[in-house]
Amino acid sequence: IVGASETIMQGTEESAAVHHREDGQFGVFVPLTDSEVTQITDKGVTVQQDFSLDFHQGQATLRIYQAREKIDLFAPEQGAELPMQGEILLEQHYAEKHELGLGDTLTVGGRDFIVAGIGSTPDYDATYEKTSDTTVDSNLFGVGFVTAEDYEALKAGGQNFRTEDYTYTYLLNGAMTDQELKELLQQAKDNNVKSVILDAYEWQLTNTGLPQEQMNDAIDK
């Protein structure tokens, strides 16, 4: 069992590297200005705007992101890696539970989308709606990715039932530590930083449901 666990974890790490799994993320109350983002990227850190909108799909919630190009890239099991306008990429378990396949039409926020890809992303290996959740239910929550133009159209349509979430993901690239980035953020935008999730502990907890010490015990054994 331990050998199988190590193989799965190794495969997960390899996939995470290929698809640029985030080193961490931070949320803000107000989007950063271009100059504030530049203050971070000039230090050698890669930053990606990863805002999202939540929509009702019957009893379920579908969280929509703009398709990613730098961090936490979509890994298709079927179909496309990036959507064209009018297309959507869906997390595979949500698609399965809702019997959605390539070429199907899905209506989100009053707009019709063609399902062009089905797969996963490193930050949603387990699709928890909130980091505090302890169970995954793909009947009730999933994620999708659309073009920048379609994302803006959905936002303008106003049918999202929660306000837009302002999250940024980052890759440190060896330029600084998580703590140094956190301090830089707090200096750059007083009272604006809502949350900072540092990857070393939080990512494991969010994506496995196991505390870090249990993960370490599994590796040691």
Question: Which residue ranges define each predicted feature?
Answer:
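Membrane transport/envelope proteins' first extracytoplasmic loop
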Residues: 1-221
